[in-house]
UniProtKB/Swiss-Prot annotation:
Residues 687-708 are annotated as: Activation loop. Pfam families: PI3_PI4_kinase, PI3K_C2, PI3Ka. It comes from the Eukaryota. InterPro entries: ARM-type_fold, C2_domain_sf, Kinase-like_dom_sf, MHC_I/II-like_Ag-recog, PI3/4_kinase_cat_dom, PI3/4_kinase_cat_sf, PI3/4_kinase_CS, PI3K-type_C2_dom. Residues 539-545 are annotated as: G-loop. Associated with membrane proliferation. Residues 14-177 form the C2 PI3K-type domain. Residues 533-799 form the PI3K/PI4K catalytic domain. It catalyses: a 1,2-diacyl-sn-glycero-3-phospho-(1D-myo-inositol) + ATP = a 1,2-diacyl-sn-glycero-3-phospho-(1D-myo-inositol-3-phosphate) + ADP + H(+). This is Phosphatidylinositol 3-kinase, root isoform. Induction: Repressed during nodule organogenesis and reinduced in mature nodules. PANTHER family: PHOSPHATIDYLINOSITOL 3-KINASE CATALYTIC SUBUNIT TYPE 3, PHOSPHATIDYLINOSITOL KINASE.
Length: 814
């Protein structure tokens, strides 16, 4: 089962009796009332042994259902421990959503004295059956009330819940096997929990009694559903105007005739297999329509049958392989065997389709191994474009030492840049407890194999030195984290923090200004960095105080890097990777839109590096120069050029605006404002800070794309020829990227198991939103009209201009 699946049982399908265990009573019993008539005639209180029992009853919709059940008498207290299994005559399938159990504790030591009672609903507010240990607070002197709503709820009020309740929930998960067992750590944890429990008891006093009950657990969650609830349909022959609801017990079940026909049609042992069978004209149209489906679409039964029927004639169509493999019944041994034989003879698929075969949909090891064999044809540059997703695909493998893991390591050993990125991508995933063991296995294999590399005849370093250079990257990031913490602790404005940074680099941490040996830059492993230049390093004016560090390189140059601590850069890393990939796809079609795919690398869950690109935000530019054109005139003046700037500069601005308008629309980039739109001196515009993607946006009523009026004015206004050229570039880029929609969708699908916030929250919904942006239902001409309407809608949006003003006010006070 993958991490994205939620498997469950329906309560209406469970035909076993309701079972639970009454465990113990916690807390101190109240002292008897001295004025009680029982105490006046009986022995003194201190000599009387209390004899307690618990009476349990089931109430359905506020009415008693069945007879009450009692536990045995227990007198060996405190604490009173029954640990008795109670089985009711009622079955889980008979329960309603408002079913509840009542528990009343009685004392027989003097008559039939009432200690207290409590009630608990069997289903929570998500309609899931409660399982595991439940701690019920008893209402002293009250018999449990089974009416709905009850007057004796056993649930502790939210404002009174302490740390102990959170721990008890974790213990329930631990006992259900949802938390990994680590013996030595578990022993320490339970000892600490006992101390917390004692502390909570002392803090709360002994004013409350609690009854601990252990509910039955199942392999999967149990979700409430009434018997036949989904199979009620209005009668088509109702003789009155009222809607008559009848239950058809066969609705929703497999039709035996259709199932038999399907088995016969696909049987490999009956009849003659016609390998030369060709589809008719209509069938060919249907097949072509199916082959155009995006990888996210599920095939219907008829579509699967159609592809299976003409599987032999489709072997020369490479696009058909992934669709064919989706229609295979892998549980049928003979069918799976023939599918694998055909796969080996099929026309070799493209790398894009191989990525689809590594998705969680395909579990067959042979299919996944075939996908890896296709990837082996890709060169290092192309492989690096998909490396982030290929590392995530390790989650879907059936073993830690898979063919994919071996392939990634072998390619990394041939290219130090691939090795550096692979090491970082794997290292970041070690924070995921569910897959830490798998990623650590790949990390170890990479380390062991790299250590075995001998020094090259042309002066190449041996494997040990190469690995040590990569390890020193981690040591560097650890020191940068320490610097960030020191700087944040400085009180005062940004200038004081900058002074502290330079003071640290020149004093305590002066070893960072000149490294003993050059280190490969984590962002660009081909570049060797030799130390930090304190005088050229600074801090950004931001809540997290990112460091802007200037590194001297081994060849005498410099490179600037931004280091951020306290921000998860994995989402930014993914978006910038997509920008880089789309830039590559556009250039393959001879369309260079002057994009700026700067480098981003997450080095941990809340830290990472970004390449610094000399630029200024549009907010700064407009504040100081009033317009974008006035700013560009300072760097590229031309009295004879359009608007007083060179034609090359204006063309760069128009193209980059078009490129990012299309990309931010497709990826659903949110939270766009003038502070995260940057402009280079050559006129190239680019976006930064991708905290919201796939349609999420903290601002109300966001436009489809970020295209502010100042950008349109820089092109001469909505009626100018340059604005028309901008729209033309947008439409051309949109249609080019639509052709590669399957590649982009496959890459996002492989990220479905990652911990990237906007994907992890709902992977299926996010990928469907991405698919929707491509408008695959339109042809190229219709998509041009669609995108032009989209541009017009974005330019005329008023609300974002109001939000921009509010954002500027917020920045002023920061």
């Amino acid at each position: 089962m993958t991490g994205n699946e939620f498997r469950f049982f329906l309560s209406c399908d469970i035909s076993v009796p309701v079972t639970f265990r009454v465990e113990r009573l916690e807390g101190n019993l109240p002292l008897p009332n001295p004025k009680s008539p029982d105490l006046e005639t009986n022995a003194p209180t201190e000599n009387r042994t209390k004899e307690l029992f618990v009476e349990c009853a089931l109430y359905i919709d506020g009415a008693p259902f069945g007879l009450p059940t009692r536990t045995r008498l227990e007198s060996s207290g405190p604490s009173y421990c029954w640990n008795e299994l109670i089985t009711l005559t009622t079955k889980y399938r008979d329960l309603t959503a408002q079913s509840q159990l009542t528990f009343t504790v009685w004392d027989l030591s003097h008559g039939e004295g009432l200690i207290g009672g409590a009630t608990i609903l069997l289903f929570n507010n998500k309609k899931q059956l409660k399982t595991g240990k439940q701690k019920l607070r008893l209402w002293a002197g009250k018999e449990a009330d089974g009416t709905f709503p009850t007057s004796t709820p056993g649930k502790v009020p939210r404002h009174e819940r302490g740390e102990l309740e959170r721990l008890e929930k974790l213990v329930n998960k631990y006992e259900r096997g949802q938390i990994q067992r680590v013996d030595w750590l578990d022993r320490l944890t339970f000892k600490t929990m006992e101390r917390i429990k004692e502390r909570e008891s002392l803090k709360n006093g002994s004013s409350h009694l609690y009854l601990v009950v252990d509910f039955c657990s199942f392999e999967h969650r149990v979700v409430f559903q009434e018997s036949g609830a989904n199979f009620l349909f209005p009668s088509p022959i109702a003789s009155t105007n009222d809607i008559v609801v009848v239950w058809d017990p066969e609705v929703g079940k497999i039709n035996p005739s259709e199932h038999k026909q399907l088995k016969l049609a696909r049987s490999l042992t009956r009849g003659v297999i016609d390998r030369d069978l060709k589809p008719s004209s209509n069938e060919r149209k249907s097949i072509q329509r199916i082959l155009k489906y995006p990888p996210t679409r599920t095939l219907s039964g008829d579509e699967r049958q159609l592809l299976w029927k003409f599987r032999f004639s489709l072997m020369s169509e490479k696009r058909a392989l992934t669709k064919f493999l989706r229609c295979v019944e892998w549980s049928d041994v003979q069918e799976a065997k023939q599918a694998l034989e055909l796969m080996g003879k099929w026309e070799m698929i493209d790398v894009c389709d191989a990525l689809e075969l590594l998705s969680p949909v395909f579990e067959s090891e042979e299919v996944r191994a075939y996908a890896v064999s296709v990837l082996e044809r890709a060169d290092d540059e192309e492989l690096q474009c998909y490396l982030l997703q290929l590392v995530q695909a390790l989650r879907f493998e059936r073993s830690d030492k898979s063919r994919l893991s071996h392939f990634l390591v072998q390619r990394a050993l041939r290219n130090i840049e691939l090795a550096s990125f692979l090491r970082w991508y794997v290292a970041v995933e070690l924070y995921d407890p569910a897959y830490a063991k798998r990623f650590y296995c790949t990390y170890e294999i990479l380390e062991e194999n790299m250590m075995k590399i001998a020094a090259g005849v042309n002066g190449e370093e041996d494997g040990f030195k190469q690995w040590q250079s990569l390890v020193r990257q981690t040591e560097l990031t650890a020191q940068l984290c320490s610097i960030t913490r020191e700087v944040r602790n400085v009180r005062g404005n940004t200038q004081k923090k900058i002074e502290k940074l330079r003071q640290l680099l020149s004093g305590l941490l002066s070893e960072l200004t000149y490294f003993d040996e050059p280190i490969r830059s984590p962002l660009a492993p081909g570049v060797l960095i030799a130390g930090i230049v304190p005088s050229e390093s600074s801090i950004f004016k931001s809540a997290l105080h990112p460091l802007r560090l200037s590194f001297r390189t081994a060849n005498g140059g410099t490179c600037k890097i931004i280091f951020k601590k306290g921000d998860d850069l994995r989402q930014d890393q993914l978006v910038v990777q997509m920008v880089s990939l789309m830039d590559r796809l556009l250039k393959l079609e001879n369309l260079d839109l002057h994009l700026t795919p700067y480098k981003v690398l997450a080095t941990g869950q809340d830290e990472g590096m970004l390449e610094f690109i000399p630029s200024r935000s549009l907010a700064q530019i407009l504040s100081e120069n009033r317009s974008i054109i006035s700013y560009l005139q300072k760097f590229h003046p031309d009295d004879h050029g359009p608007f007083g700037i060179t034609a090359t500069c204006l063309e760069t601005f128009i193209k980059s605006c078009a490129g990012y308008s299309v990309i931010t629309y497709i990826l659903g980039i949110g939270d766009r404002h003038l502070d995260n739109l940057l402009l280079r001196n050559d006129g190239g515009l680019f976006h930064v800070d991708f905290g919201f993607i796939l349609g999420r946006d903290p601002k109300p009523f966001p436009p489809p794309m970020k295209l502010c009026k100042e950008m349109v004015e820089a092109m001469g206004g909505a009626e100018s020829q340059y604005y028309t050229r901008f729209k033309s570039y947008c439409c051309e880029a949109y249609n080019i990227l639509r052709k590669s929609s399957n590649l982009i969708l496959n890459l996002f699908y492989l990220m479905a198991g990652s911990n990237i916030p906007d994907i992890a929250s709902d992977p299926e919904k996010g990928i469907l939103k991405l698919q929707e942006k491509f408008r695959l239902d339109l042809d190229d001409e219709a998509s041009i009209h669609f995108f032009q309407d989209l541009i017009n809608e974005s330019v005329s949006a008023l609300f974002p201009q109001m939000v921009e003003t509010i954002h500027r006010w917020a920045q002023y006070w920061r």
